[in-house]
Swiss-Prot record:
Homohexamer. Catalyzes the decarboxylation of 3-octaprenyl-4-hydroxy benzoate to 2-octaprenylphenol, an intermediate step in ubiquinone biosynthesis. It catalyses: a 4-hydroxy-3-(all-trans-polyprenyl)benzoate + H(+) = a 2-(all-trans-polyprenyl)phenol + CO2. It is an enzyme of class 4 (lyase). The keyword Metal-binding applies. The active site is at D322 (proton donor). Binds 1 prenylated FMN per subunit. Pathway: Cofactor biosynthesis; ubiquinone biosynthesis. Its EC number is 4.1.1.98. InterPro entries: UbiD, UbiD-like_C, UbiD-like_N, UbiD_bacteria, UbiD_Rift_dom. This is 3-octaprenyl-4-hydroxybenzoate carboxy-lyase. It is found in: Cell membrane.
Length: 522
């Protein structure tokens, strides 16, 4: 189903009972987090906080708090009563689409050639279009009117350093690429018009910024942040879209209609384009540092001094409660100065929180897991299922089900998964099992681990590999080890012993008891 903007999606959710309006006064300082957390854990609806007692904008929370709403946002109209299972299964179709776009198979005949041409035409037809007089610029704040404190920016946890923008869709462009990058990076409020842009070094926005700083030393770097885009664009920014396809094009494919864009209006930022029907847009720059920077506080990490980007204004970010369930360390990141804020009339502020799973990122991880499966199966046909348990903080542990064909096969699959998608670069643990193990049932996975693994033979340790920057368990920030567990049945060459045969009841006996079951009244 097509959703032209966030309001359209909110209306649809309300119609099908997936959104609740909250008229009571709920503070964006801690209270919204507690309420959204309880509702998410209960599998409840999205929440629209409408009270203006403390702020002038309604706040939308828990938007993607169930896999069904993620599927709806991706254009899959999961029916009421089907549950999250049906929604997750439908998301594999999105994965098959991505798989075809990433590595299209050569046509086997005229019919296949026609399908390939139709897919290519669909992608071409989804090229975004620029519109004039966009709704996202109905209201413009400039000069001293630019005051981020007027937005209901959440403070999520008691130990947080301050208010935090959590669902900002950051738009950047590097000097060496024709396409824009869309990324979701948290942003700490530190002043009337200043935010800390927390993008990690490997993320697209940080790469664009470094390349710009190298080629344009001393020049301000333009940035736009979108708050409240349509669901297809938001989800396109967190999906492994092929490098040859822009997130705006992919959003158009999901939506079934071209993405309408608007040029930013701030001089110097007008080279960036944002969704024309976005609720709120922040426009501005990362400026070069003026004068000597103040010294780092006692006990804080040193300021960045290497690289062209170090010459730009930076500030100490955090600590903040994160998706790991812990407060992260403080670190230096660039400062984004907001020069203009544009918005729609009666704009909606879209927000979330992150914390110990389950949270909204964990739910997104469960949903995107289904998108990953066809991508992996296209590359590794022996993989029969794949699961990222939400308790593993979205991606830190993966369970792989496979059809094993030779000794050492499971280890090949481990290294294949680690190297296939950027998303799996930070997966610390991979457990590989056979087809007879339900990888979504921890009881079965633990049974396979404890009965099919010899720790010395079946454990793979890889040291000094890229690790999530937030993983404080690693000995060095961003660098740590990985573990693979081969919980498959062992083949000749992997063991000299007679391997155990699983106990299975005779089918005829099971059928006989099936017929007696109702009579027995058990």
């Amino acid at each position: 189903m097509k959703y032209k903007d966030l309001r359209d999606f909110v209306g649809r959710l309300e119609t099908i009972g997936e959104l609740r309006r909250i008229s009571q006064n709920v503070s964006p300082v801690l209270e919204m987090t507690e309420l959204c957390d309880r509702v998410l854990r209960a599998g409840g609806p999205a929440l629209l906080f409408e009270s203006k007692a403390q702020h002038e904008f309604p706040v939308l929370g828990n938007l993607f708090g169930t896999p069904r709403r993620v599927a709806l946002g991706m254009g899959v109209d999961a029916q009421a009563g089907e549950g999250d299972g049906a929604a997750l299964e439908s998301l594999r179709d999105v994965g098959r689409l991505l798989s075809a776009l990433k590595e299209p198979e050569p046509p086997k005949g005229l019919k296949d050639a026609g399908k390939l041409f139709s897919l290519a035409k669909a992608v071409w037809d989804m090229a975004p279009k620029t519109v004039s007089a966009p709704p996202c610029q109905e209201i413009v704040w400039e000069g001293n009117d630019v005051d981020l404190a007027r937005l209901p920016i959440q403070t999520c946890w008691p130990g947080d350093a301050g208010p935090l923008i959590t669902w900002g869709l950051t738009v950047t462009k590097g000097p060496n690429k024709s396409r824009q990058n869309l990324g979701i990076y948290r942003q700490q409020l530190i002043g009337r018009n200043k935010l800390i842009m927390r993008w990690l070094a490997h993320r697209g926005g940080a790469l664009d910024f470094r390349e710009f700083a190298l080629q344009n030393p001393g020049k301000p770097y333009p940035v736009a942040v979108v708050l409240g885009a349509d669901p297809a664009t938001i989800l396109g920014a967190v999906t492994p879209v092929p490098d040859t396809l822009s997130e705006y094009q992919f959003a158009g494919l999901l939506r079934g209609g071209r993405t309408e864009l608007a040029k930013c209006i701030t001089p110097g930022v007008d080279g960036l384009q944002v969704p024309a029907r976005a609720e709120i847009v922040l426009e501005g720059f990362i400026y070069p540092q003026e004068g000597a920077p103040s010294p780092a506080p006692a006990g804080a990490p040193p300021r960045p001094v290497k690289g062209a980007s170090a010459a730009y204004e930076h500030a100490l970010e955090g600590p903040y409660g994160d998706h790991t369930g812990y407060y992260n360390e403080q670190e230096w990141f660039p400062v984004f100065t907001v020069e203009r804020i544009t918005m729609r009339r009666d704009a909606i502020y879209h927000s979330t929180y992150t914390g110990k799973p389950p949270d909204e990122p964990a739910v997104l991880g469960v949903a995107l897991n289904e998108v990953f499966v066809p991508l992996l199966q296209k590359q590794f046909s022996e993989i029969t299922d794949f699961y990222l348990p939400p308790e593993g903080c979205s991606y830190r542990m993966a369970i792989v089900q496979m059809k094993k064909s030779y000794p050492g096969h499971a280890k090949r699959v481990m290294f294949g998964v680690w190297s296939f998608l950027r998303q799996f670069m930070y997966t610390k643990f991979i457990v590989v099992v056979d087809e007879d193990v339900n990888i979504r049932d921890w009881k079965e996975v633990i049974w396979a681990i404890t009965t099919r693994i010899d720790p010395a033979r079946d454990t793979v340790l890889v040291d000094r590999t890229p690790i999530d920057y937030l993983d404080f368990a690693s000995p060095v920030a961003g660098l740590g080890s990985k573990m693979g567990l081969d919980a498959t049945n062992k083949w000749p060459g992997e063991t000299d012993r007679e391997w155990g045969r699983p106990i299975v009841m005779d089918d005829a006996v099971k059928q006989r008891i099936d017929t007696l079951w109702n009579e027995l009244g058990l």
